[in-house]
Amino acid sequence: MYRLIMALLMFMFVASPGYSQSFRDNNNMLLGKVESDGTVRNANNMRLGKIFEDGTIRDSNNMRLGSIEKDGTIRDKNNMRLGTVSSDGTVRDNNNMRLGTISSDGTVRNNNNMRVGTASGINTRYAAVLFFFNLL
């Protein structure tokens, strides 16, 4: 459940009309994608849920999983703060500990600066959430 929330969170406010956006692990294996309407699918094209324009994230059964605020604050289904994604791509947990970064080219790095994956066509502020909060 936690991984699903994070996968959905990473795509908030980032779906662009006309194409889907993908995220891959360090071995370039497809982890999933988000469609232009906000629908999130895994690598097997199974629908995981949807991200809505207001920041609400729901699973495939329409259950609220969490949200992401416009300032980058990530919240769980009980509205508890999980962490943040800053405009420069830095990801921090709820205790303000730096977890890693995602660069403007989509490269995701952990706190030791090791590459952990990529996020193609995905807003860096939200893509980092998947890799650092492991909700998918």
Q: PLM ranges: what are they?
A:
Residues 2-48, 53-55, 63-64, 70-136:
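Long terminal segments
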